Amino acid sequence: VPPSSLLTMEGANIIFNLSASNELIGKHAYLRSLICQQSARCMAGYVYASSGFGESSTDLVFAGNGIIAENGNLLAESPRFTMEEQLVISEIDIETLQNDRQVNTSFMYGTSGLPKEKAQVVDFQVRISDGFSLTRPVDPHPFTPSGEALKERCEEIFHIQVAGLAKRLVHAHAQTAVVG
């Protein structure tokens, strides 16, 4: 089990992975996919930073990958192979991640069987300066789809309710019912 999986099952919302992974042909696409997949499996934010130009040698080349993913979505990525320092910025919606974990029974079940480790909790305060603006849009209604997705969601809710009511009526041997 990857350490990031264990950490998220202990309650971590964001994984910070500091790496010294060298470059190989085709490795970057695999790495990007792996980070997005792991952030989805963990229902977490995943911040990856790898060694850069200054750490390269005659034997190994480091591209200086910086990747930020959230629950399977690539949010931001730094340019590779630069000789300059890189700064990658994005927001990770912790409240949405925590909600997703609460409603996902597989995630909650997975956490119940873990031996309780002594996880270190780090409290911190974020100070927002004047003129601060987000780098990505934040949906004010993240749990309510729109357009065609809303129609599909409502139909799904309706069919779930109908199936539940039908099962109850069969179980109660009801010959008639008034629904209103």
Positions of PLM-derived features:
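Catalytic P-loop NTP-binding/switch module of NTPases
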Residues: Q86-K151, E155, H159-I160
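A phosphate-binding catalytic loop at a beta-strand-loop-alpha-helix junction
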Residues: I157, Q161-G180
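CN hydrolase (nitrilase-like) catalytic-core segments centered on the catalytic cysteine
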Residues: P2-I89
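Generic helix-packing signal
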Residues: E70, I94, L165-R168
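Short acidic (Asp/Glu) and glycine-rich catalytic loops that position anionic groups and cofactors
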Residues: I15-L18, P137-H141, H173-A174
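A sequence-level detector of short, solvent-exposed, charge-rich linear segments
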Residues: L31-I35, N65, L97, Y109, ...
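Catalytic cores of large soluble enzymes that bind and process phosphate-bearing ligands
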Residues: S4, K27-Y30, S146-I157, L169
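Domain-wide signal for the mature, well-folded portions of proteins, strongly enriched
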Residues: V1-P3, E77, L97-D100, K167-A172
